[in-house]
Swiss-Prot record:
Pfam families in the cross-refs: PBS_linker_poly
PROSITE patterns cross-referenced by the UniProt entry: PBS_LINKER
Protein name: Phycobilisome rod-core linker polypeptide CpcG4
Subunit structure and binding partners: The phycobilisome is a hemidiscoidal structure that is composed of two distinct substructures: a core complex and a number of rods radiating from the core.
Organism annotation: Thermosynechococcus vestitus (strain NIES-2133 / IAM M-273 / BP-1)
Length: 251
């Protein structure tokens, strides 16, 4: 049964402001890729790579993420950019690397950032969309996002989604890795995956875990490494002592 999306109140975000004037044209303004502006094959390839970067949040397009059939259809203008984004989001690779390793609440936040170019307004919106995932499944959730009025007004059929009105803070691709905290701690990728080497220093959870200077807990490992020499009481019974052998004798 398709339940209607629960009502939630939008909060103030930069993308809801029509213009910031000259501040819109700073170095943080992303380049907007449009299929209408692609007149050559190389320019169409740039649009395709931009779609991969936006959906998979990877700086380098990996070979096993590519969807050759969808690429061919987009190059020949058989499908739109919106359809290409939809195909990438519904691909098996995206499901295995993003959907399967996150709970519904974090999945909503990740998809809002990558498909609508904004973060979730509040917890109410996350709950509303997570219910949509529970009733329609993830593919139905993707259709609901890409067919929404917000997506149509912001990007239409031929514009690659991008982070809208980023005036400060870090790009979404750095704050929404495909693993969540729970999954990273569970499988132990936090210490071995290179993507989190720098990321962990900005995580609130990691900052709270860092101990201040002078905290005795910082020297716990040092104290455990010290192996003091211990002296134990002599374990010898009186019945085991040969007293006669110890009596001095004149020779």
């Amino acid at each position: 049964m398709d339940l209607p999306l629960l009502a939630y109140k939008p909060t103030t975000q930069n993308h809801r402001v029509a213009s910031f004037g000259i501040a819109d044209q700073n170095e943080d303004t992303p380049y907007i890729y449009r299929l209408e502006d692609a007149a050559s094959y190389s320019e169409i390839r740039e649009v395709i790579w931009a779609c991969y970067r936006q959906v998979f949040s990877e700086h380098a397009t990996l070979a096993f993420n590519r969807q050759i059939t969808l690429e061919s259809q987009l190059v020949n203008r058989v499908i739109t950019v919106r359809d290409f984004i939809r195909g990438l989001a519904k691909s098996e690779r995206f499901y295995n690397t993003v959907v399967a390793v996150n709970d519904n609440y974090r999945l909503v936040d990740v998809c809002l950032r990558r498909f609508l170019g904004r973060s979730a307004y509040n917890e109410e919106e996350k709950i509303a969309w997570s219910i949509k995932i529970g009733t329609l499944g993830f593919y139905g959730f993707v259709d609901a996002l890409l067919d929404s009025e917000e997506y149509t007004n912001a990007f239409g059929d031929f514009t690659v989604p991008y982070q809208r009105k980023r005036m400060e803070g870090r790009p979404f691709n750095l704050v929404t890795p495909r693993y969540g905290f729970e999954y990273r701690d569970k499988v132990g990728t936090t210490k071995t995956d290179w993507r989190f080497t720098l990321e962990k220093f900005y995580d609130r959870k990691f900052q709270e875990r860092r101990l201040p200077e002078g905290d005795p807990r910082k020297y716990r490992d040092l104290a455990a490494a010290i192996a003091p020499k211990t002296r134990y009481a002599q374990q010898l019974r009186a019945a085991d002592i040969d007293y006669l052998a110890k009596v001095p004798r004149r020779r």
